[in-house]
């Protein structure tokens, strides 16, 4: 019984560690999704402003420079590690939206994995409770026989 409880505790701890790792990954995905959504909003805002409007562009964390919006028909988009591609404006928006969809799909997979781990934890707890109840019943039966 004691070894069985220890094994169950270790399994529960392992599942909880996996859940924490998956939650951390979801947090990173959420940050990336937020960044991509902000990029979409910024591109759309710049397009709405139109050519010739003045905007402030950040240069590092403490400086900004004034620039005029020129043509918004081309956008340079990161398509991989240190690789960028020049895309048409609408194509760039679609590319970013597709990336968001992929990340949301992956996020859903991680959430499902977390739900499965919680189900495994619940199964282990139920198993431990059942074992405990069976042992109590066995002890009571042995006590009755001893009397």
Swiss-Prot record:
Molecular function in Gene Ontology: unfolded protein binding
Keyword field contains Protein biosynthesis: no
Main location: cytoplasm
Domain of life: Archaea
GO CC, any one term: prefoldin complex
Family assignment from sequence similarity: Belongs to the prefoldin subunit alpha family.
Quaternary structure (record): Heterohexamer of two alpha and four beta subunits.
Function description: Molecular chaperone capable of stabilizing a range of proteins. Seems to fulfill an ATP-independent, HSP70-like function in archaeal de novo protein folding.
Name of the protein this chain belongs to: Prefoldin subunit alpha 2
Organism: Methanocaldococcus jannaschii (strain ATCC 43067 / DSM 2661 / JAL-1 / JCM 10045 / NBRC 100440)
Lineage: Archaea, Methanobacteriati, Methanobacteriota, Methanomada group, Methanococci
């Amino acid at each position: 019984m004691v070894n069985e409880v220890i094994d169950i505790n270790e399994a529960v701890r392992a599942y909880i560690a996996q859940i924490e790792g998956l939650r951390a990954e979801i947090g990173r995905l959420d940050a990336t999704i937020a960044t991509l959504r902000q990029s979409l909003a910024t591109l759309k805002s710049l397009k709405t402003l139109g050519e010739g409007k003045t905007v402030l562009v950040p240069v590092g964390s403490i400086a900004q420079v004034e620039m005029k919006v020129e043509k918004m028909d081309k956008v340079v988009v990161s398509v991989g590690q240190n690789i960028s591609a020049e895309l048409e404006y609408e194509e760039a928006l679609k590319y970013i939206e597709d990336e968001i969809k992929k990340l949301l799909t992956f996020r859903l997979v991680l959430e499902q994995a977390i739900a499965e781990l919680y189900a495994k934890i619940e199964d282990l707890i139920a198993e431990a409770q059942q074992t405990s109840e069976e042992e109590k019943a066995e002890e009571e039966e042995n006590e009755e026989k001893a009397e």
